[in-house]
Amino acid sequence: MQQGSLFRMQFSMSDSFSAVLANDGYIPLLVTYTKQDAEINSLRKASKDDLMKLEPEYFSALEALNRSKCILLVGDSGMGKTTFLKMLCICMEGELENHPKYNLAKITEPVVRTETGIVLEVQKWDDGALRPFLLDLESLALEDRNRKKFPDEVKDAELILIDGVDDIDPEDWKWVASEIEMLHAEDPDRYFVIACEADVMNRLRPRLPGFTSYTVKTLTDAQKYLISKQSSDDPDFQDGEPMPKVPIGLSEALKITQSYLSWTTMDPKPQSVQTFFEAELEKSPLAKAEPEFTAYKYFTQKMDQREQQKIFASFQSDMNQLRYLACKYCLEENFNTRFEKLVLELNYQSWAMIRMLKMIAKEKNAENLKSMFLDLCPNGEPKAELSIKALIAADLLFEIRDKIDILREKKVIQLKKWIRAIVENGWLTVYDRIIAGKRLSWLGDDRELTELVSIPAGSFTMGDYLLPNNQPVAEIKIKAFKIGRYPVVNTTYKEFIDQTGRFWLSEEKDNCERRNYPAINLTWHDAVAFCNWLTEKWQTEGKIQRDEIVRIPTEAEWEYAARGKIISQPDTLIYAWGSGWQDDYCNTRELGLNDTCAVGLFPQNESAFGCLDMNGMVWEWNSTLWGADPKSPDYPYPYDPCDGRENTKDALDNIRRCMRGGSFGSTADHATCCYRGGLEPIGFWRGDGFRIVVSKDNNGTRN
C-alpha cells in the first residue's frame, strides 16, 4: 500500500495495515443528527406524552454520508474520525477486491443508535462499493510545502476522504477548498468526507457550498460497553457484565473514544483528570524530558513541521495529552502571560485548549483560579480586538461557578459589559458568539429581551417569484403595529409557565446557559395562551394601553417586519439583510449547529425595522390559517385578510397554521422572508417558536 500523503488501499499489499487499523475493535461512529430530526414533520403531530418517551436515535457517520453525499465530519481530537476514514477506505476497496473481511458488510455492521439501548440495526448504505481515495493534508504539506493542488490520481475516485485539515496553515485552506469545489463541480455524484476538529472547521473560510456538517457524538453507554468488552484481558468477559464506572471528575475527558479506550486498560483506574493524564504520560518517551514545557513549545513556538510532527508522535499522537501538559505548564506560574500566548497563538484551536483547562480547573483551588481568570478580562470600554480575552475569562469562570460566588465580584459587572458587546456587535466568529450568548445568560442578560419595535403603516411587496405558494406577488397595505425585536425567549416563557402551571415539554427552562434562547417545543395554542396571559399582565403594569392586545402576527405582518420594502425580483431569495445568501448571517442548516442559540447573535440578520433572527433560528407561528393539505394552502395569494384565513376562532386542529422564517434545521432557500410553511396547531418541535405583536385590534391588515 502506498503510504504518506496519499492512501490508496490496495489489498494485495495492505492486509497487515488493515488488520492493525481495524484490530477488530472498530466502533462505528454516531453523529448528533437523529432520526427524530429527520422525521420531524411526522413527529410534530405526536402527543407530548408520546414524545417524552422517545429516546433519540442517532444516525451513524456512514449514514450521514449516505444522506448528504458531501459531509464535514467534525469532532474533538481522539473521537475516531481518522479511524473512520481509514476503515471506510479499506472496506470500500476491500469490497471492490472481494476481500473476505474488510468489505461493505464490515463498514455497515449493526450499531446501537440510542444512549442506553441494546437493539442493533444495520447501517444504511445505498450506493454499493465506491473507488476511494484518502488524502492526508498534513503529509501532503510535508511532502511539498509549495504544493497548491491535489495529486492527479484523485480524479479517478468516486469517494474522496480528506484528513489533516487541523494541521494545515489556514491560508492553505483557500487552495484546498478550491480543489474540492473543482472536483465536486466536475462530478456532482462524487462523495466527500472531510474530517476536522469543530473549532477549526467552524472558522475556516471560505465555506464549502453544498457540504453538510455533522458532529461526531460522544460515546454512548452502549459504545462504552463494547469498548470495555473488546479491551478486556479477561477471556471469560460475559455479556451483561457491568462496565467500569466513570468517576464524575473524569466524565468530560472520557467522552472521547481514544481517552476512554485508554482508561479501560489502566489498572488501577485513575479517578481524576490529573491522575489519568499523568498515567498516560508514563507511556511517552518524553516523560523525563520536561514534558510540560515541550508541550507548551509545541503550541506556541514556530518550528519546522517535521520537528512538530516528531514531538506529536513522541506523545503517542495524543493531542489531548499535549493540551493537558501545556495547560499544566500555564498553571505553574505566570498564568496570564503564558495562557494568553498559548490561546492567541493557537488561533483556530484555542477553544480545545480552553476546554482542557476547564477540566483541570475543576480539581484546583477555586479561590486561586478566580483571581487568575478575572484578571484575563481587559479594563476600559469594550474593544473588538481584545474581546476574545473577556470571553475566555467568562468561560473559565463559568467552570468554577459551583465552588465560589463569582457573580458578586465587582469585576463581573465589567466582564458582562464586554460579553454583551460581543453579542450585540457581532464581534469574533459566530461560534465564539454562541459561547458568549451562553455566558451572558449565566451572568444575567440585561438586554430588553421583550423589546418591541414599531412598524409604521404602509404597503409592501408580498411574495416572490420562486414558488407557486408564494405567488402571485402583490402589494399589501398594513396598519401600524409593534412586533418583538426577538423571538420569545425561555426566561420570559418560563415566567408564564410558573404563573399558570401550563405544561411545557422543555429541558431548557431551568438551564442557566439558555435563558436567552428562543422558547421552543411550543404549539400554536401555547403561543396564543402566552399572548393572552401577557396581554393581561402588560395592561395591568401599564406597558400597553387597555385597548391594545398581545397576539402572534399575521402572515402579512410577519413578512413586512422581516423584509421591509425590499422588492421581489425573479430568481432572487429575499432575506432581512437584502437579496442573496450570506454565510454566517443566520442560524440555518448551513451553519451546522443543529440547535438554537442566544437571540441577537447575528446583527447582520436585522430587518430594516430592527427585528432580529427572522431568518433561521426557529420557525415562527403566525395567526393565519393554511389549510389541511401540507403542500398546498387553502388560502392562496394574494393575501386577503377578509377571505377567512384570519378566522382562527372556529378553525379545527386539523387545519394548519402558517409558520415563517425557517429554523436551524432549514436550508437557505427555506429560511427566507417569503417561504411559507404550515403545521397543525397541536404540532411542536425543538425548532418551533414565536414572536409577539402588539396592536389595537386582532387583524393588522387594512383593506
Please give the residue ranges for each predicted region.
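GGW-centered surface loops in extracellular recognition modules
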Residues: 1-19, 426-427, 431, 435, ...
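Charged, amphipathic alpha-helical linker segments immediately N-terminal to NTP-binding catalytic cores
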Residues: 4-46
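P-loop NTPase signaling cores
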Residues: 35-286, 293, 300-306, 316-321
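Short, polar loop/linker segments at the starts of domains and inter-domain junctions
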Residues: 37-53, 143-153, 307-308, 462-480, ...
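Hydrophobic repeat-domain scaffold segments
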Residues: 247, 251, 308-314, 319-449
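A short glycine-rich, aromatic-capped structural motif
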Residues: 447-506, 515-535, 615-616, 692, ...
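Functional-site microenvironments in short loops/helix caps that host divalent-cation chemistry
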Residues: 461, 508-513, 522-675, 702
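Short, structured beta-strand segments at or near domain termini in extracellular proteins/domains
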Residues: 684-700
